Amino acid sequence: WLLRRDGQSTIDLRVNCIPTIFGDDITMRLLDRDVGLMSLDHFEFQPREYDLLVSVLRRPSGLLLVTGPTGSGKTTTMYGCLQFLNDGSRKINTLEDPVEYVVKGIRQSQVNPKFGVDFPELLAACLRQSPDVIMIGEIRDPKTALTAVRAANSGHLVLATMHSPVAVKAIRAMVTFGVHPQNFAESLIGIISQRLVRKLCQRCRQRIDLPENDAFLDDVRPLLPHDWTPVLYEPGRCEECHNVGFTKPICVPEILPFDTELRRMVADCRPLVELDRAAHGSGMVTFRQAAMTRVALGQTTLQEVMRVVPFDDLRELEREEWEEPLRSAIRSASHSDGNGQPTAAL
């Protein structure tokens, strides 16, 4: 349903209902169509993150994957990328399930599996429309994966989402779909894996001392402003945030642009651990850097980072060197406030 509020925006209301032994279980999802259409400038990306993403989007062709679990903001990021590309110089087609936001100047199509029109069929038809940019709502089957790679290798810029916890694991997911590693490597220009953390209310956040052992911030110090003050923050309470301490969610992205060496490793089916190490050396923005930068700038808390970062997957990639220092920092920070006084653990 569409709910139009007098003098305000239009709300898209989606209702799902299933029967239970206690009665109907109803879930409602609200989408504010105006709020959802944000340009990349409003994503609060850090300068290096923004520059990396824009450098990928400026490529004339190739495949950009946006990955993460359900509710991690993938669709919002995709629309932000489309807004950046939608300057009138390109023909842009989207394949969505469903179309969540109507974007002027973009040709948007919606899948309808009941009538045999799913992503593979729509994508095949879309390629005959001579698009410059194709956005695929989700790669969830082998046929869509194969066609997306073929489109990216034939001169189209293809943006697609899929479920993958960290950037390099999207490679394994695509190969599992039956995509030939050589063809996939030739198409790949970047992978973004992301999570959402709650942003601290900037009006009532409470200052706390930086723990004595602040090694968990070592590799993000070069990314911070020169006048950065070494303090952290925890949530407070005020009317502006309805006494929650947090406001809107913000994106924590892991951004991996692909260069010649990384493509060679994908084509050679190198182990994910090796790919991940090479990605670190190629200039990717890691979850650690993105998350800790937002903590250091007072945008979120250490606890929020621990809540959303996929540590199990990072351990599999042998990226576990920051989990225990982070836990230690939380323990230290939870016992003192900005005046050196003890405070309750959060």
Role assignments for model-derived ranges:
Residues 1-346:
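Short, flexible helix-loop junctions that flank or precede catalytic/ligand sites
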